[in-house]
Every structure is written in structure tokens, then in C-alpha cells.
Amino acid sequence: MKVLKLLSCIAFIIVLTSCERKYRWSPSECALQHYPARILTNNFQYKNGGGVGTLERVAGGSGWGYTGASYAVGERLKPVPDSLFVNWFSITEGKFYKGKFKLTSKKIEEALKKGQIRVYTCFAPHGRVVVYVAGKHGRAPIDRFRAIEDTSMTIAKHILKINGVKTEQEFEEKYGEKLDGSTYLKHYIKKEDSIYISKHGIPDTW
């Protein structure tokens, strides 16, 4: 009897999963023009498991609300994303942020039905995260969140990780120079960005 009930439950779950509507959409990211962010993780996860995400890269050139790179990931038709997992380095602040958020799936699905084909995450200083949809009807914000600072990660640890070494001594032996976090930051912050930030500071509302 128990076996029959278990099989019935499994069959019911399979039916629900197979009936889940899917849409044509792709993930992307963005950041403010003068406040670049190095995206470490930007994953949209499905309710029944799995998901799609973007690659690790620096965002910020497109400006707020405008999508960055286009990613042809996953199947052509995908389920509506249910949650978002993010982890990034706010370059202008020198801080790392992380968070996992429940998305307003109903709003996203309504937008996808209308022909929106891009679901993307915009990253701002102070852990601000805004999820947008975009397509033939323009773009619109769906959700706003605030991530927490990841104090376990530092610029030095990040540099060691992306260079495939474990200690500062290994870094010096490999590259013949001392690990310098300020040099790393200057590599991503343009002169015009520095001028803009010195005039306007780092705002906390988006």
C-alpha cells in the first residue's frame, strides 16, 4: 500500500513538472556606469531545481537598467525563474556582497507572456540589487533587494583565488611582485569614474 502511494506521489510530481509552462528568455546583468561591479555569481534558479546564470565578468559600461552581455544558456524554452543567487564585488566600495532572494515569479511570467525575453540583475553599491525584464515592450523593474556584505572575503583573498594561488608568497613567486589590492582596483576604475565619484560620492538609493 505504501509503495502504491509513493508511486502515485512520484507520478503526480512528474505530471506537475511536465505541465510547467516554459518561455523563451535569457539572463543578463548590468551595473551603474560609474560604479563597476565584478559579477562572481548571478544565477536564476527554477522552483523544481536547476537554473541558468551569467559568466563572471565586470559590468558597468551599459548604465543602469540596460542589459549587458547576452547569454545563450540552457534550453531555448525555460521555466520561469523562482529565486536569485548573487555574489559580487563592488569595485568602488572595495566590498563583497552576497544574497539569495525569492523572485516575484508571477510578475516575471506576465512579462514573458507579453514578449519580454531578457531577465537580468542590476548591481549597485551598498548591496542594492534590482531585477529587470526587457524586450519588445521596453524594460521594467520587477524586484528590489538588498544583499549582505560578505565579510569573509577580502580583496587579497579574491586576487589569490582568481590567480590560482593560495598565499601572497605564492603570488609573489609566480608574478615577481607583491600583491597590491589598490592596483587591482585602479585597473577597473577609469579616470572619469574617479572624477565622477569624487564629485557625487556613492549614493545609497536606486
Where are these regions (language model features)?
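Activation corresponds to long, low-complexity, non-globular regions
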Residues: 127-206
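Structural motif
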Residues: 28-39
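Low-complexity, Pro/Ser/Thr- and charge-rich linker/hinge segments at domain boundaries
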Residues: 103-133
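C-terminal motif of bacterial Sec signal peptides marking the signal peptidase cleavage site
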Residues: 15-18
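Sec-dependent signal peptide recognition
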Residues: 2-9
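Edge beta-strands of extracellular beta-sandwich domains
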Residues: 95-102
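Tryptophan-paired
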Residues: 42-92
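Bacterial signal peptide processing site
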Residues: 20-22
